[in-house]
Amino acid sequence: MIFTAENTLLIGSILLFVSIVVGKTGYRFGVPTLLLFLVVGMLFGSDGLGLQFHDAKDAQFIGMVALSIILFSGGMDTKFREIKPILGPGIVLSTVGVLLTALFTGLFIWWVSGMSWSNIYLPITTSLLLASTMSSTDSASVFAILRSQKMNLKHNLRPMLELESGSNDPMAYMLTIVLIQFIQSSGMGVGAIVGSFVIQFIVGAAAGYVLGKLAIRMLNKLNIDNQALYPILLLAFVFFTFSITDLLKGNGYLAVYIAGIMVGNNKIMHRKDIYTFMDGLTWLSQIIMFLCLGLLVNPHEMLEVAAVALLIGVFMIIIGRPLSVFLCLLPFRKITMKSRIFVSWVGLRGAVPIIFATYPVVAGVEGSNLIFNIVFFITIVSLVVQGTTISFVARILNLSKPLEKTGNDFGVELPEEIDSDLSDMTITKSMLEEADTLKDMNLPKGTLVMIVKRGDEFLIPNGTLKLHEGDKLLLISEKSKEEETDSD
């Protein structure tokens, strides 16, 4: 079956429905949803139910749009106060770590491809290109698994991995693009390569900062009667940021990530609506992107390089990633050995390497189909081996801790412009022994009870209300000066 105007909506809706149902099942058992989305795409593809989707350029465009949204949303969720203590190791891992992973893996691929038993041969530059496409990690899958297991990480590992995963995709992208240019232009020297890196970094970072500030200003100053248009305005900024940065020869992915950080760490109007919109859009983008990549691959072609791809994947998991991590973290003495081992293990490959593997295909690089199939196979190996063992490894290394509760049980949030905090409190037996009415409770100064939840019933509070064990109180209090400083 091929895609037509008549059946595209039907096929798309079925794929989305199946993906969500399968993803929900996998979420319960700690299986990466990314893996399941890819599998659904493969099952419906040319070697499965027969959906024909072979245009790498279309897949690349879909991936570019989806990745822009995902990186911007990831930037919005990155908080300055959380990443500040681990800024150094996070940045080193996302830059030097990517370079080292690409170098070690590329040299290994070149060595393996020259062996007599190998069914592939790749010159050194193509080997490095292959390694570069899969040198970035996908920590989003890691945290989805940890959330499904109700698990968090000790020693600031979570923000460090979030920072690495959010900022290492631009580095892998630059390596991929520069190596494609080098392969196709024999006259490109070392100076031109270094210059290209510097320009992409500087322009990308500057554009992200400036346009992020502009987005904040417009969201807060532009008076739109329909508040549902504010998230759409921000989405327009995401695409504008990527496109204008790319037009200026900068790194668009770096720009949207930095712009997301700027927006997420400043006061903006209609924050709740914007976050809800972006969260849903991010999930939709991931599902569509993974499905398209699953449809694009031909499993029978992938199996032809399975042996070599498996060997490369094992090298990356056991040697390449750990060696890069340990070298990058050498200057940071406070990071424990167990933490280094865990960071080495969670170098999960996701959809981004597959997207980057379409760039050589579109550019017509010799051996590009081979690169795509190897990257796809290694991504599946990584998700199966590493993705299903993350929580187990965290427990073995004693790095796991219970997931802290966020928000409140009432589903209520305050607008950003209201300078107060919401929290909730559950009444215990010991509390009732000291005070059994609201007026007798010793609440902190400046704290008010907004509503009381008793079972499924909501009660309007007054001073004489008799409290029961298990009652939940929604509290509003003045924001502390320390919190205000952190948010500025």
What kind of feature is each model-predicted range?
Residues 1-403, 407, 417:
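Transmembrane helical cores of multi-pass secondary ion antiporters/exchangers
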Residues 78-81, 299-300, 434, 457-458, ...:
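Short beta-strands and strand-coil junctions in structured, solvent-facing domains, enriched
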Residues 92, 424, 474:
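Short aromatic/hydrophobic contact patches that present stacked aromatics
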Residues 412-418:
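A glycine-rich beta-turn/hairpin centered on an aromatic-Pro dipeptide
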Residues 419-427:
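Short glycine-/aliphatic-rich beta-strand segments at the starts of folded cytosolic domains
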Residues 428-480:
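Cytosolic Rossmann-like ligand/nucleotide-binding regulatory domains
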Residues 465, 485-488:
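Short, compositionally biased
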